[in-house]
Amino acid sequence: MKKLSKRMAALSTKIEDRIYPPLEALSIIKENANAKFDETIEAHIRLGIDPKYTDQQLRTTVALPHGTGQSIKIAVITSGENVSKAKSAGADLFGEEDLVESINKGNMDFDLLIATPDMMPKVAKLGRVLGPRGLMPNPKAGTVTNDIANAIKEFKAGKLEFRADKAGIVHVRFGKASFTKEALFDNLKTLQESIDKNKPSGSKGKYWKSFYVTSTMGPSVQVDISAVQDYQPEG
């Protein structure tokens, strides 16, 4: 077993072996995020699904009200006048078959790939390089679209694509340590609602297995999912 660093061991002593109310958990995470940079805050959620079955797969998007605090590089594969539209909308990389060839050679300097439907037959050939990295465009994720400008705008503003991995776990960033705990909770609540709304039809038994939050360099804290689900804003 990998030995904990002195810093991680010290931070871990501040966390009790129990499930925390969400705002208390976020306060602890923020307090422990004392690295020399603005740490990313992440959620790791184990769901009661088996993604090897198509009716138990989860892949969708969510627009976080306070964004993620991170800038992302977006590549767009399209054709004709849409190439200039992608450029004007703020895409970091854009092109037609030239970009397809570049990606096929291993040039993957982007965080998100958007494609127009007419280019998907060519993009499909990139499955072996895009698939393992979770970058293959998908209509459900809003990354296969003719409305390139709006898609770029939304993803740049903090819209996230997320999915459950092979073990049924969702890993998603939802803010920065510099965010207030209230802003982090708003984002976390929005994420929870999206996961519930998009519950796979084949899910059986208990849907939410465990719910942890953590920072880039800190230990994780288990969150009371019921308290997140049942929260109602005052007024």
From Swiss-Prot:
NCBIfam families: rplA_bact (TIGR01169). It comes from the Bacteria. Belongs to the universal ribosomal protein uL1 family. PANTHER family: 54S RIBOSOMAL PROTEIN L1, MITOCHONDRIAL, LARGE RIBOSOMAL SUBUNIT PROTEIN UL1M. The lineage of its organism: Bacteria, Bacillati, Cyanobacteriota, Cyanophyceae, Synechococcales. One of its GO terms (cellular component) is large ribosomal subunit. The keyword Ribosomal protein applies. HAMAP family: Ribosomal_uL1_B (MF_01318_B). This is Large ribosomal subunit protein uL1. The keyword Ribosomal protein applies. Binds directly to 23S rRNA. The L1 stalk is quite mobile in the ribosome, and is involved in E site tRNA release. Protein L1 is also a translational repressor protein, it controls the translation of the L11 operon by binding to its mRNA. One of its GO terms (molecular function) is tRNA binding. Gene3D superfamilies: 3.30.190.20, 3.40.50.790. One of its GO terms (biological process) is translation. Part of the 50S ribosomal subunit. InterPro entries: Ribosom_uL1_bac-type (IPR005878), Ribosomal_uL1 (IPR002143), Ribosomal_uL1-like (IPR023674), Ribosomal_uL1/biogenesis (IPR028364), Ribosomal_uL1_3-a/b-sand (IPR016095), Ribosomal_uL1_CS (IPR023673).
